Amino acid sequence: MIQTEKDIHSIQELYRQRAQEFQANSERLHSKYQRFALVRLLAFFGSVALIILIWQYSGLAGIVAIVVFLLAFYRFMTWHQAIKREQEHQAELALINQNELATLDHDFTMFADGAAYQDPLHPNSIDLDLFGPYSFYQYTNRTSTALGANYLASMLTTNVDSTTIQKRQASIKELSADLEWRQHFLAYGRKAEDTLEQVNLLKKWIKQAPFIIPNRLLRALLILMPILTTAVFAWFLYQQQFFFGVLSLLPALALLRKHVLKVNSVHEQTTHAEKALRHYALLIKHIETKGFETEHLQDL
């Protein structure tokens, strides 16, 4: 019993230290992001003023300055947003460790209880407290995506043979030894904010025939039209012929109008899943960083 208490205290200290470390990292990155947000604002207005000044001396030099500014500002924005994403990731890691600290005091309320998966017709769904408050599902639930939550419920309600059970136990043992990898994986998934409805819409979209790839002319126009439109528009602005500059946009608008219904249909099926897909990619990338030893994990 004394040894058990020592083990619990050691685990508590581990989670407490990790929570403090990740929280400190999050606060440091947040301060850095805020500082450079001001720099970004000043750089934007300063660059606009500089471009106006250059344009007064030379329209061509002004166009070059605009292109350089857009490229530089895009790179800066990308770097700045990367700081924000890492800050949010560190904050998630801090919260994960705080949650695990709470579980050592028998508080599992921060985890979904899976009540939606209760099935009165299932022989063990209710009488074994598989789902609902203080259920086995809530006790074991460390899923971070809708697909993961659904898969866990399926595992608890589907009979499997002893060989499969042994493979799962071996994979659990392997993963239990790598706290760092597990928590980063969980943190990436927690930001996905996916739903089964989004997943079903994506599956429906994937099964649809593409309307761009088979059309060679459309593929060529997708590449050439933005380049030509931008070049012609910039030339008319340089010549101060604004009316013709506006007219140069009409071919691109006509092409867009022709395909707008199809584009809107694709947008409807994918727009809400963009964030989820981005985080699915992070999860897959994180899986690829680890070489698994057990057969069950290698088959993923």
Give the ranges of each region predicted by the language model.
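Alpha-helical bundle segments enriched in helix-capping/polar residues
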Residues: 2-300
